[in-house]
Amino acid sequence: MKLSEAIKFEIEKIKNDRKNILSEIRKDGGYGSPASIKYRERLDEMYYKETDLERKLYVERNRELDVGDGCTYHLWSDSYACTVIKKTKKTITIQRDKATLSPDFKPEWIPGGFAAHCTNAEDQSYTYERNPNGEIYVCHWSEKQGCYRSGSDGSIIIGVGRHEYYDYNF
C-alpha cells in the first residue's frame, strides 16, 4: 500500500469519528450543551490532525509522481496537462500533452472587464493524449513546499493528475 493510501484511510477514519461525535452532540442537546463542551477539545484535536494529514497526503501524492503519470503544469491562471517522462531523485521531466476542448463547451459572455467576462469557464472539459512533440519542462522537488516546481523563481507548481484550463478572463 502506498503511503498516500494509508494517509487517505486515516483521514476517512477521522471524518467518521467526527461525524459520530457531532451526532452525539446533537442527541445531547446541540452546541452549547455540556456534551458539546466535553467534546470540543477532542474535535479541535481531530481538526488539527486532519489538517496535518491532508498536508502529508498532498506531499506524498506529489512525491509519488512517476514516469507515465499525468500531471498539471499550473501557470498563474492557466493550466497545462502533461505527462511525466523522466524522474530522478530531485527532479521530474514533464512533457505537454495534447488537450482537446470538448465541442460541447460554449463560452458564455457578459459585458465587463476589458471587453467581456466568461461566466462558465469552470465548465471546460478536455480529452488528453500524449504528444511526443510537446514542450518539455524540468521541475525540481521543493522540500519546503512539498511539490515539484518550475520557473526561474519556482513559482510554477506541478500538480497530480491532468487538468487543462484556459482562463478566458485574463
Regions found by a protein language model. Give the residues of each.
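Mixed-charge, low-complexity intrinsically disordered regions
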Residues: 1-80, 91-170
